[in-house]
Every structure is written in C-alpha cells, then in structure tokens.
Amino acid sequence: MAKKSGEGQKIISDNRQARFNYHIIETYEAGVALQGTEVKSIREGKVNLRDGYALIRNNEAWLLNVHISPYQKAGDFFNHEPRRSRRLLLHKQEIRKLIGKVEQQGLTLVPLRMYFKRGWVKVDIALAQGKKLYDKRETIKRRDDKRAMQRAIKQY
C-alpha cells in the first residue's frame, strides 16, 4: 500500500531502479493527466514506474510505458489501457528548458516517484544520464562497505 511522507504527500510508487541505472542531474515535479479509473487504480497503489520514461513531442511532455493496472471494480468497457501515453503537466518554460537539455547526447527523462499531493497525482521526473557498468559496480561496492561499517559500529 502507499506510504505517507511529509506534509500532504502520500507516496504511491518509487522507482529505485532508476536511481541505480542513472546519474540524476535535475528533478522536476509534474502533474499527470489521467482518466477516472486510472486514479482509482493509483489510489490502490497498482503502479509500476520501472520501465517508464518521458518524451517531449510538439512542445508537450508525455509519460510513456508506465504501467497502471486496470481498475478491478470497473468493467472492461469503461477501463483504461494499462500502458497508454499520459500527458505531463509542466510549465512552458520548464518544457523549453527540458527540450534544450534532452537534445544533449546521453540525457533522458525518467520518472522517479509518483505520489499524491493535496489530492492531485504528481510525478517526479529526473533529467538523467545513463550509468556505465563500472559505475554500477562502484555503487554496489560503496553500498556494501557502508553496510559493513554500520554492522561494525552496531557491535560495539
């Protein structure tokens, strides 16, 4: 189920894999244009951000490949398509800034987390650069070293 964090924020889904696979450069908060059954399914926490990414087409930001499970209590006729493209609600100046940065080689937009903020569904989008294999190994090594140090401190 979703967990609470901070004032008026309820985290629905967290994309931990994105933090491992990418160097996060900047983050942006964006609203998402959703259908009714999508919101109901999100309230149940049935969202997967792992394979998701964002694109900018015709000066509009789009969230692609994010899986929101169909709402169980709605019939098939009224339900939404699980992996449809969803429009991100950003200010024009933010979109212009992102267009310039995404055109640089190797930068992409990935969703980091989805949450409710005062009843509205929000997504944290990160401008990110892909990590190389040796960067990932270094991250794992640092995490293991930190864990070993914490264990040693706890014993004393």
From Swiss-Prot:
One of the entry's Gene Ontology molecular-function terms is: RNA binding
Known InterPro entries for this protein? SmpB, SsrA-bd_prot, SsrA-bd_prot_CS
Q: Where in the cell is it found?
A: Cytoplasm
Q: What is this protein called?
A: SsrA-binding protein
Function comment: Required for rescue of stalled ribosomes mediated by trans-translation. Binds to transfer-messenger RNA (tmRNA), required for stable association of tmRNA with ribosomes. tmRNA and SmpB together mimic tRNA shape, replacing the anticodon stem-loop with SmpB. tmRNA is encoded by the ssrA gene; the 2 termini fold to resemble tRNA(Ala) and it encodes a 'tag peptide', a short internal open reading frame. During trans-translation Ala-aminoacylated tmRNA acts like a tRNA, entering the A-site of stalled ribosomes, displacing the stalled mRNA.
The record's HAMAP family line, in alphabetical order, gives: SmpB
Quote the NCBIfam families the UniProt record gives: PRK05422.1 (NF003843), smpB (TIGR00086)
Q: Give the species.
A: Trichodesmium erythraeum (strain IMS101)
